[in-house]
Amino acid sequence: MPYLLSASHIKLPYLLSQEKIMEFSREIFGSSFKNIERLLRAFKNGQVENRYFSNDLEWFKEEHTFAEKNDIYIQQAVEFGKEAIEKCLANTEFLIDKLQPSELDAFFYISSTGMATPTIDARIMNELPFNPHTKRIPIWGLGCAGGASGLSRAFEYCKAYPKAKVIVLSVELCSLTFQRNDISKSNLIGTSLFSDGISCVLICGDEVSAEKFSKKDQHLKFLDSQSTLMPNSLDVMGWEVKDQGLYVVFSKDIPTIIKDWLKPNVESFLVENGLMLGDVKDFIAHPGGKKVIDAYHEALGFNESMTAESMGILREFGNMSSATILYVLERFMIRGGNIGEYGLAAALGPGFSSELVLMRWK
């Protein structure tokens, strides 16, 4: 079965503490909310400590048009995306020798925070030495579920083409969607949580020799995936596209939906693979926020040790939309696992939807 060979992430140039962002939010939103101090508790209750951004704090104090923000998205997505790819293909944590972009058979590009045609993958391929016949699969609009969905689609590609090497690159510059004049509670909560992130993983078909390329004795191998769309839930999460740009849609009911909907979804998927919740040893969860992680515990009966890696990423980086789960996955790949144990990746996104990926250490 296809397996994970390498991974990378990059730290964007501007590191801001949650305290500093909270002060900025008080300055920007203070006159618009009568209960601003109560609302600002979200910055502390969410347990995010630091976040990385592609622009400095002064940039957010100024007005920017949708066109200007999207132009910056294109420029920075190419710049930082190239860096993440090169790091993934040369990551000495995982690889014996550096791989070349020309060795890749397919390029999955995941994003929801900016738009480009030609897509970012095409622009990157013009700047790195890719084979011009590399298959390009850009995937847009899956939000926080996008990283897990990209993982699923890449695994399925390598299952069909067992000699293939493919990358999944996720670029999310959530901060470029910031609306300083949006005085909705959703925008304030989003400001307390979201950040910028770039991550990349390298996946290989089972006819690609792990012994030739990998420093690791164990790898997470793909077993199955499941995509699920909840009917009549379009208003739970997503964007409203307006003249000024992208406005966040973020329902307060998301934790409740997870508690009620996720467990039967996960259990039926595991049963189809002859497993139960207790068989999952590594839970590779997208940390949508502290309340989302708490909802995982309540819905699935997992203790805090099962979400420790996810919680660590949330504390250090915040919610980077689709990129976040790949940061979590990299932590598991560095740590390694016991042969035969199962890992389950899970992420939730607009639709409302979920993506589950079942893997096993081999």
Model-predicted regions and their roles:
Residues 132, 139, 149-153, 170-196:
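Active-site glycine-rich loop that binds ribose-phosphate moieties when present
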Residues 6-8, 110, 140, 165-172, ...:
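Short beta-strand segments
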Residues 48-130, 141, 277-293:
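Conserved beta-ketoacyl condensing-enzyme motif
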Residues 1-75, 180-260, 264, 348, ...:
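Condensing-enzyme catalytic core mediating Claisen C-C bond formation in acyl metabolism
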